Every structure is written in C-alpha cells, then in structure tokens.
Amino acid sequence: MARKNKKFSAKISTPRAKNSGYSEGGASRDNKSLKGYNPRKLGYKADIGANLSTLRDRSADLAINTPVGTAAINTSTTHTVGAGLNVFPKPKFQILGISAEEARAWARKVRAEFDLWAESKDCDIYRKNNLYDMQSIAYQGYLTDGDSFAVFRRKPTTPDMPYTLRLQLIEGNRVSNPLTSSTYVTGDPTGVEALNPDNGNRILNGVEIDTDGAIVAYWVSNQVPGEPITSMLTTWARVEAYGKRTSIPNVLQISNDTRPEQYRGVPYLAPVIETLKQVYRYTNAELTSAIIKSYFALFFTEAVTNSGSLNDMLADNGVDDPTEPVVDVSEYNLGPGTLNALPKGVDVKSVDASNAQSTFEVFSTQLIKQVGAALNQPYEVLMKNFNSSYSASRAAMLQAWEEYKLRRKWFARDFCQPIYEVWLMEAVANGRIEAPGFFDDPLIRKAWCNADWFGPTMSILDPVKDMNGSTLRVQNGVSTREREAAEMTGTDLEENIAQLAFEK
C-alpha cells in the first residue's frame, strides 16, 4: 500500500511558483531573447565617472569629424544660443515698493550698463571674446564634453571699463583629480575618486565634496592632462566653489544632471555614439564604392578556341611570354568616332559601373531618424530636410523648438543669470546702479536681480499665420507684446516703438 501511495504521489506534479508582473516580461530570466541580457545599473562613479574620458574623446571626434554629429551640435547651438542671449531686466516692483514706470526706467539703465560690460572683450580674461561669443563657446563645450566651466576673475578698472569682473572659460577635461602627489590617491582603480589630505574631502572627477556631498571646490589643471604639445608641467589649483565671506559663486558649472549624486555631465552625443560612428563608416564605404564604380575601365581579353588561346599558341612556338598583356594598350585610343582594329581572338569588355546599393538612402535615413529622436531633434530639423507638407514641417520645427527652449532655460539658469547677478552686485557696490536694500535683504536682492533671457527666434514658415497667432496670444492675455517681439524677431519692444515713432 505504501508503494502504491508513493507511485501515486510521484505522478502529482507540484505547480511551480511564478512571480508576477515583470517576471514574465522585461525581468524574465527564462525568455530566450533575454537570457543573455543582464546589464547592471550602478552608481555615478561606475556608470559615468569611470567612462567620462572615453565618452568625451569619442564625442569630440564625432562633433568634429562626422557630418551628422557636427550638425547635431551646431544646430542645437544655433537655435539655443545663436548670436547670444540678451538680458531683459524685470525687477519685481511690487516687492520693491516702486512703480511700474520706475521699474522700466531702472531696467533700461541696467541694460545699458550691462551691455557696456558684456559687449566688450574686456569681460573675457583673455580679451578675445565678448560675453555673447562666450555663451556660444560655453554651450558648445557643454554639449561636447558634458559640462563646461566659467571662473570669475578680477582685474583693475580702466578709463573705458569701470568694472573689475572678468570671466575665464575652462573646458571640462581640465577639471580633474590632481595627480601631482601620491597622497591624493585612494586606491580607486578607475581613477574616479581621490582624497584631499588637508581636510579629508573626497574628490570625484575633479569636484571636491564635503561629508554631506555638497560641492566645496574644483580642481583645475593649467592645461589638459596628457597634452603632448607643451613646454609646461601639468599642475592643479584648488578653486573654492563659493566665496567664504560673500557666498558668491567663484565657479560656474554648466551641465544637465540626470541622476542624483551626479557631479559631472555626460556628453550630449553619448547615447548615439555607436550609431553615429556606424553611419559615418557606412557613408564612407558607400562613397568609396561610388567613386570606384564611377571609373570607366576596359579589359582586353582573348578568345579561347578548341585549339587553345592565342597566348597558348604563341608560348608553344616560343614567340612570346604567355604572361604578357594580350595587346599593347598604348596602340589604341578612345574618343568620339574612333575606330580601332583588334587582333583576331581579342575582345574588349568594360566594368559595370552601375551602383547596386540602392538601399543606402533608406537605411541611413532610418538610422539618422533614431539619432534625432534620441537627441530630441527631429530628422527634418537635424538634416535641414523640409520636403514634407507645411503641417509636417511646422510640427517638426515646433517639436525641436521645445527642446531648444528647454536647453535655453537650463543654460540661462546655469550661466547667464549667475553672471548677471554677480555683475549687478558690483554695479550696485560701485554706485553706478542704484538699488536700495540690495545688500540688506536676500529677498530684495532677488527682486532686483529678476530678469528674462531671450535669444534666437524660431524659423517662420508662414509669417501671416505666425503673426495672427501672436496677435491672438496678446489679445487673450497669454503673452505680452514685449515677449512676442523678443521671441518672434529678437527685438526690444520699446526700441521698436521709438523707431516707429521716428519713422513716422
């Protein structure tokens, strides 16, 4: 009986417990297509910090040497920054206790003073670019390297420049862990983390943080580490992130973080590096193939008969070497109306110059569309290809414009606005601008510093439709004439009104 029960129980299969949810989907380990797919998501140091150098180098190469990579960087720069973002001071007159007219008069004076500094090359420590040129340089560096830096410097005033503030732009690869002393090394094999022996702070990819993880300093080298063409030794300087007495930033880091505890930015082209490189290789291969196929080549061949070829008979009689060419090509010419008599048994054949790779455009277009989708730049805008209908082209431009506006917000917040605030502090301190209560209350200071930043406008496909839309936005109170003038034409409304009155 026991044996029978044992056999009966053996026949009963115990149901295998199955997890629910993603266990049978994206997290399945039994699905054949996912068995070998086991990536790991780690922290900032392993996922980003350890790969930054490689990502920067490859991104820089694609931005310089591949047409699509160059287009992605330049198109974003052109539409986000363009010739430069202009400041429109907007003091919050309700908080400041002044009238709207007084606020407008103050804004006009501040803008004129700011342009005195910003439009001069004296604002650059190297005296090479004005602020608006530096915006483009900083933004391109941020896209290529993942982040870029600006250091506030000071120089004495001159009769033509009443401000001491100067800016020094620094490429992202110059901010790195110091390698001048073994005391900075922590044993990290990736080189991501180092240690400041003076205070025990950790240094992650050149960014020094305290025990709370707050940024306290940046380590900046005097040249790119590993620079082959140089007469200097590479040294590092510790630049405190904020002033000790004023808490004013000493360094601006322009980056777009996507993860908590991320201290360095990821290059803009990082998600599409492999695809861009493959498109470049495929394009080069097709170009080489097309060039080769464009050549018109002729081959002289000999006819083979039952008694052998012409060379066989000549070789048997000891007349000629069978390895010699069939004919002397210098005796024949190609040209219109030209007749050439060939020896018996000799024929002429040409190489087929047709291009059999008819799928190149379709395949490459699909790959570039994927690149554009990953970068939030529609294919039509990225490749400047507006062959679709008006509605489709406008939809592509509007979608791209949302991306550019978002990046402009980031850039203005990280770069332009902090520079404006530091400049305004000096302007108020030296008496060139009056702002009562500026240094007494942070809320009052913030109200004086409030400003909008406008840059290049969206391309207009149908001016009539866009103007009608602008008019309706103003009439319904969802926008202002000043904003519409700035966003549609990049001009100042008050200057337009004054010029129109003069022209009448």
What kind of feature is each model-predicted range?
Residues N129-N130, F152-K155, A290-L298, L382-F386, ...:
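Short coil/turn segments at secondary-structure boundaries
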Residues L131, S136-T230:
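Extended, Lys/Arg-enriched charged tracts that mediate electrostatic binding to polyanionic substrates
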Residues G213, V371, E484:
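Acidic/polar, glycine-anchored loop/turn motif associated with catalytic or activation segments
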Residues R104, I125-R127, P336-L461, M488-E494, ...:
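Surface-exposed loop-to-helix/strand elements on domain peripheries
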Residues N222-K244:
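Short, surface-exposed, low-complexity cationic segments
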